[in-house]
Amino acid sequence: MDPKRSQKESVLITGGSGYFGFRLGCALNQNGVHVILFDISSPAQTIPEGIKFIQGDIRHLSDVEKAFQDADVTCVFHIASYGMSGREQLNRNLIKEVNVRGTDNILQVCQRRRVPRLVYTSTFNVIFGGQVIRNGDESLPYLPLHLHPDHYSRTKSIAEQKVLEANATPLDRGDGVLRTCALRPAGIYGPGEQRHLPRIVSYIEKGLFKFVYGDPRSLVEFVHVDNLVQAHILASEALRADKGHIASGQPYFISDGRPVNNFEFFRPLVEGLGYTFPSTRLPLTLVYCFAFLTEMVHFILGRLYNFQPFLTRTEVYKTGVTHYFSLEKAKKELGYKAQPFDLQEAVEWFKAHGHGRSSGSRDSECFVWDGLLVFLLIIAVLMWLPSSVILSL
């Protein structure tokens, strides 16, 4: 945001305690913007001076209203969501409550409190559902809701459409209209990221990263947290009158703009921590069967022990099937310029926090995980073989 007018700016960030939300808040704060972080739990990091944290549950309208009480908010960055990966993907009720009801609450309060701008953090998944997409753009239709392989993607699609349909909604007392846009980021990475990278490192350290899968030519995309911060700030500016409200009612794909094989992207992390990158490659359909089994085990045992599934079916598609998108619209309308980044920062972060291969022997837990992994893979092979035979006939 323009520092010359940042004194007048007061923004509210839902999901502000999360990795990306906190990073965005710090960047805006450095520009002199008054920042309010709204989340169900407080940030793990020290909150810088000038940033206010308000604890609350986005599912409760009264909590959302309280977050707006003491500030004349001029822009909301709606980042809060639930169910992106792992065991969270299997909690359908909570996913809907946070992603859909939470968005309804935000839109309602924005209208009441006469907030002129709302930037929604969406996902590639509103378009992608396991089909190959090469250099897709924003003209692609939404994936039909019943075709989404997971509830997170389905609810994010519903929420994005609600946000964009709310564009130009009159604010209370006839005080202007609400301008909205949606950013669809690829998978986020960066030093200190707490969702995807720690899970991957945990698998590496437990000796579970034994294979890759799918076509080695398959391509996906990622976005560094700082590029995503840049895109959100630009989007909020592009909703202004002096920018011709160019982003008003529009979606934008956001990534680093460098399609890459999913497993090759993570090779520097594996080898940088001193581990051997696996050479075994399995068929995508076999791993999909394996993921189905882990989901079934979680369904049966999850109430007794809410363990982290090794993989979900959606994660298999997202990592093993080609899907990447053009940045032309974001470049042209927002002025977005992706900066070059890699995983080296993340490698150094993990090393600084005690991760990396040591010279000691593997502990007994690794052998237990090995046994469970082999057992599930054998069952997956038995499930997969009949279907592979049928396909070959």
Curated annotation (Swiss-Prot):
Protein family per UniProt: Belongs to the 3-beta-HSD family.
Q: What EC number(s) are associated with this protein in UniProt?
A: 1.1.1.-
- GO function term, MF aspect, one: oxidoreductase activity, acting on the CH-OH group of donors, NAD or NADP as acceptor
Under which name does UniProt file this protein? Short-chain dehydrogenase/reductase family 42E member 1
Can you cite a GO biological process for this protein?
steroid biosynthetic process
What membrane topology term does the record carry? Multi-pass membrane protein
Q: Note the PANTHER family from the entry.
A: BIFUNCTIONAL POLYMYXIN RESISTANCE PROTEIN ARNA, SHORT CHAIN DEHYDROGENASE_REDUCTASE FAMILY 42E, MEMBER 2
Q: Where in the cell is it found?
A: Membrane
List positions binding NAD(+): K156
Q: Which residues form the signal peptide?
A: none
Q: Which residues does UniProt mark as catalytic?
A: Y152 (proton acceptor)
Q: Does the keyword Oxidoreductase apply?
A: yes
Q: Which GO terms describe its cellular component?
A: membrane
Q: Record the organism.
A: Homo sapiens
Q: Which SUPFAM superfamilies match?
A: NAD(P)-binding Rossmann-fold domains
